[in-house]
Amino acid sequence: MLDREGFRPNVGIILLNQRSEVFWGKRIRTHSWQFPQGGIKHGESPEQAMFRELHEEVGLFPDHVRIIARTRDWLRYEVPDHFIRRDARGHYKGQKQIWFLLQLTGRDSDMNLRATDHPEFDAWRWHDYWVPLEVVIEFKRNVYQMALTELARYVPRPNHHNRYLRSGMRAHRRDEGSEHNDHLDPTGPHDAGASVSEPKQAE
């Protein structure tokens, strides 16, 4: 389902643990890590799509999390042509996303990467809030930056420092009411001061 400009409606999920670290999922059979995300189906609200994707990709139910905040407007990114199927070129332009910030109220053991027969991740870990900005594939980096920046003030931890943000980055954003979503490539070792847990494999 595309809007008139060729963007597919989508939701992104930033899931926090009690230490305000973020869930970071390793895409199945790749070396890429990213936040959970997925398309909004016809007739779904962004919140309904978020809870569906949360269960499909992470195995969590609504009673395992609490919604802290969401982005005010759609955040858009365009996908380069070489990432788009040939039959979709000229029609599909990219993704427009509403991002949700969630607090995990359950336990790590509640997560299940094989909740469906089409898993997205085969491992996961907890990561410092800002570190993912440095390991996101370039064409999605602006949206990650904007979502993390907009939602950072709601994170229940003092003294956030956006030391990884780059100047000059911009993402397309529109009011939610206007007319009118994958591949991430980690680039190497993370900052020595960053909080990173050991990857947990899917069982």
Curated annotation (Swiss-Prot):
Coiled coil: none annotated. Its EC number is 3.6.1.-. Residues 173-185 have a biased composition (Basic and acidic residues). Residues 6-149 form the Nudix hydrolase domain. GO terms for cellular component: cytoplasm. One of its GO terms (biological process) is mRNA catabolic process. It is an enzyme of class 3 (hydrolase). InterPro entries: Nudix_hydrolase, NUDIX_hydrolase-like_dom_sf, NUDIX_hydrolase_CS, NUDIX_hydrolase_dom, RppH. Keywords: Hydrolase. Residues 170-203 are annotated as: Disordered. It comes from the Bacteria. CDD domains: NUDIX_Ap4A_hydrolase_plant_like. The keyword Cell inner membrane does not apply. A motif (Nudix box) lies at residues 38-59. Its cofactor is a divalent metal cation. One of its GO terms (molecular function) is mRNA 5'-diphosphatase activity. Accelerates the degradation of transcripts by removing pyrophosphate from the 5'-end of triphosphorylated RNA, leading to a more labile monophosphorylated state that can stimulate subsequent ribonuclease cleavage. NCBIfam families: PRK00714.1-2, PRK00714.1-4, PRK00714.1-5. HAMAP family: Nudix_RppH. Belongs to the Nudix hydrolase family. RppH subfamily. This is RNA pyrophosphohydrolase. The gene is rppH.
